[in-house]
Amino acid sequence: MNKKISLILILAILLTLIYYPYKPKIAENIKYGVTFSPTYTQTLGLDWKSIYINILDDLKVRNLRIPTYWSTIEPREGEFDYSSVDFMLDEANKRDAKVILVVGMKQPRWPECHIPTWAKILSPQERHNKTLKVVENTVNRYKDHAAVTYWQIENEPLFKFGDHCDKPNA
């Protein structure tokens, strides 16, 4: 029994001596950013445009993720209003900020699925088709915008949670 304990103790000491001096390489040039949601900013009772400008100018944020909530850009079926997205991308571009533009039904910030009121009465298949149309419209509108460096298609699309979300068909 003592031999077993001694062997385990020696092994533990050896492993400690081998791995203790190991220091993982510290990452360099980490790029931090923020997700900015005008909708959430407004729920806090704040002026989203001035807050956005302050984030860009005062905090010097140069990496952003911007949701394009379906309920905001198509409040009525077939009527698109991209004015808020235009503003954010143009202001980001003026400051050489990079933007990940989020498109689709499921996007950052609760309730996850930002479905316009008019689309909630549609069947899941009809809603799916309308979602594809708004994604197509948004991508075509911003595909050449200098501030858009990446696209995020849906946010956690295969997770089954989220208020008013259709079940994923994966």
Give, region by region, the residue ranges found by the protein language model.
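N-terminal Sec-pathway targeting helices
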Residues: 1-13
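Hydrophobic alpha-helical membrane-insertion segments, chiefly the h-region
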Residues: 12-21
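Boundary/entry segment of secreted carbohydrate-active catalytic domains
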Residues: 20-62, 67
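Secondary-structure boundary motif
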Residues: 24, 94, 140-144
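Hydrophobic faces of well-ordered beta-strands that scaffold small-molecule active sites
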Residues: 32-36, 64-66, 99-103, 149-153
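Active-site beta-loop-alpha junctions enriched in small/polar residues
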Residues: 37-41, 69, 104-108, 153-158
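Aromatic-lined substrate-binding rim segments of carbohydrate-active enzymes
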Residues: 49-119, 132, 167-170
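Active-site cleft segment of glycoside hydrolase catalytic domains centered on the general acid/base Glu
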Residues: 77-82, 111-170
